[in-house]
Structure formats: structure tokens, C-alpha cells
């Protein structure tokens, strides 16, 4: 059955099937704006405006070696072409029509983009590690050294006993004690480790709590920075006569990154590092980054711009002053060594065969030596066999680097060994330093509780990582470690003791307000609290300080100690002297309890009558 519609469609609408189709509606032609010169001026003006806003916000380096520069130029060209579409009255359709328009009306942007693409491709090819493996492996000049003869034993006042996490904890706690600052400011996350007056410290500025607090305090700037002593764990708040106005926490023109970009538009920079000079003036050390292989490969640093954080004054130094500690970042040095370790026998050897291919271990630490800070990291074979074959020490100011052959356990194996000694206390080990103890390569690390506070110290022999010593102070730890080395016939009898000179001692005087005693591992330990103190500040062992049992409340004493005998809670006495005028009474009767199973002897100590 055929169904026919005549005069109306299926929906009931009238139509004439024989009528001719209606012609398409013609598009009304768009008119171009002004003259050709006027259109070019408008297009250029809008492009420059967009470029200025982008440059102010994103701050790309105007440098062919900077990848972001290509994106910036591409944005300018695209902006110009879009403006030209509107100002020229373009009505084309399809990709072909747009392409034809761009070639005719946007000739300059078209050829600029084409040139950029060619330049980027050639630059990437000339930077390709497959073709330039020899150049990549030569980025970091490396000399070999002898551990026993070149690595000197470090005195206690040069060993950093805090890691970054513990320093941050102390910094936050210190700011919380400052009622005039804690409501407006926070501690920044820099915590740069430097050598300051011959001591290892971490320094960090404050930052504004939020945008409102920045608005309220911007005219005065940031009022202070913190110095955390890595040996004594003391935190000092350095208040400035004039606040820091050029930091990473600032906004607009005083923002450090923007300040650098406007002053040095063609420079590429590493992440700025906060340091202070020997006078305590805060600076930002901004290493100048360069690409040395092709256009985009072989990242290296060449000199640095120093920016005064207070005034904003800046100057480029090809050779930075001696007080500067961080020109080459740890990440850069490690990256360059990994290039050396992988490619010194060619690129294809790093994939097939892997003869003598080495890489750095996961993790690194810092060590103060002379006036500089050295990066330490281990070196292992590419197979990852849980053992080190040596380690690197690299000067972060000059990039002078030495490799020391030293086979033994990896840092993480040593950390596991140390944690195993205190597993009942659940302490965590920090990433270790490598020290020379009686010509034995030794891992040194702090043991922290869950609150990130340092409670003990550990030393692990690199060659025989089952030799582990712990102690409440660095001195205790070293003494125990030397005895273990002696028992294992690794050192001679004359190396089993620690040489001490009178200059190694410091002293503190006070009148005894309270004495408590405890028995730890069979030894009588005495804890002293002086007048004016709210907590016990001196700990002494009767085995080392013979006069300790004769002390009484009311005695005025001078306690001698060494830097390495200092913990967060007390100093470890090496000797005590009874000063003139003190009471000379009979020895008190002492009552004590065993604390072999206690983590804190003071909590279990009994007060002496």
C-alpha cells in the first residue's frame, strides 16, 4: 500500500513538492577596520599588551636556551593572528582558508613561528644525549681521593646533629614563643644549611601568614630571620633594624622572582637560596643557570646574582664571595655525577653491558669543612645490590668534587642497623653523614622520636655494618664506638680513647638547687638543677666524675663539658669543681632505681634527701 502526501508533510505542515529550493542566505560581508597601517598598529598594540601581562605574571627568560621563551613567542604570534582576523574582516572557511589568510595577512608571525620550530628541533637534536654522551659525562670534573689520608676527623662543634625536619620543628616552636610575631608571620621553608662564623647552622626567613597580613605589614617588611645551630640545637631570632622587603613571600614588584627578571631579563636562574653574610645581613643567592650542550642540554651554573633581601640591591658575581655556600645545588651535582657514572664508557654501554656504570644512592647530606659546605652522597653500582662502592664530597660553592673508593653498606642499610638497636623505643634514624673515626669510615646519624626531636646518636661502621654504637650524646656514642672497634681489632689500644685538650672544654657555673640520681646500665648517674632553672640541666656519671657523689644542695660548682657532650635536655659533665664558699658537708645518702628499661632516666630518678 503506497502512502502519498499531497500538500502537507507528515507533521501536517503545508509544502509544495514541486517548488524550487530556496536560495542560501548570503552572509553579509564584514568590513575591515581602518587602513592597513592602522590595522597593523592595532594588532601590534593588542599583542604587546597581552605579552606585557604574560611577561609580568609568568616572567619567562628572554633567552633561546630557555624553553619557556618559545612558548612566550608563540603566544605573541597567535595573539597577533587572532587580532588580524577581527580587524581585517576575514570571512574564509576551513583550515585552508585560515592558512591562506595567515600567509597573506600575518607573514611575519608565520615565519617567526616556522623559525622557532626549526630552531627548537635543531636545538633538541644537538642536545640529545645519544649523540652527546661524551659531553654530558664531562659536566662534572671528578678527582679521586684517599679516605684515610684526606678526610680528617671532625671536631664535635663541626658535626651537624640535626636534620632538616628537626630544625623545622625547633623553628616553628621558637616562633610560637614570640607573641609579637606569631599572629602575623610564619617560618618560611628555606632552612638553608650554611657555615656561619665557623659553625654549621640553618637559616630561614619569616613569611607573611596570608595576603591580609602581607597588606598590613608590607611597609615594614619581614622583621626577622631564624638561625638554628645544628650542634647545640639553639634557635636564635635575629631581629632586623629594617625589615626584608625582597623575598619569595612578597607580591608585585617586590617579589624576588619578578625583581630578578626585570633586572636580568635574559638570565636563567636556579631556585634562589637564602643565606646571610658574616655580618648577619640577609641575601638571596641566585645562581645563573646555563645550557652548555646544544640549546637545551647540559645544565650548569656560572656565577650568581646576590640580592640584598632588605634593600633589593643586586650584583652579579662570576666568582661569588667566600661567605656564599650554595652556588651549585645538591640536585644539580647529583644529576651531573649520574651523567658521568652512566656515560663515561659511552651511551650504549649504559644500556647494554653496563660495564662500570654507577649512580648515586637515594639521599644526601651536608658536611661543614673549612669555610664551605660540602655535599655528601654515596655511589653504588647500577645493579642496586645494597652496597656502596664509594662516596662523593662536592664543594657547593666551587663544584670541586672528589670521589673516595670505600666499599661497604648503603646509607639505608646503616639506618636500619641503627634503628634495630633501639627498636623498643621506635626511634627513626636520620640520613647519615660519613665521618672518619680512627681512620675507619663511619656513618653518623641522629635517632629521633615521633615528634622529630633528637634523642640519641648512632655510629655504624661502613665496612662492617653489624658494628653499631649508640649514645645519649655524640661523645658517649663515639666512646662506645671506639670500644667496639677495639674489641673487633679494627684499631689499636692508643686509638681507643679520645684525645682531649684544655681548649676542648667549656664550663658553666651555678648553685645546686636539686639533685637526683639513677642507675643506668649499672652506673650511678647524677642530675643537677641549678637555682633559677625549671629543669635539670647537668648530667654526670660517677664513673667519670669521682666527686659527683659528694655534691649537696646549696653547693656552688663549676661544671666542665665539651661541645659534643650537649643534648637538647642537658649537658654531659666531664668534671666538676667545688667553688670557694660552698658547704662542705658529709656525702648525702642516695636512693636510686634501675632505669635499664626506661627511655628517660630523669623520670625514674629519686630525689636525694
Which residues does each PLM region occupy?
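Soluble extracytoplasmic regions of secretory-pathway and membrane proteins
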Residues: 2-609
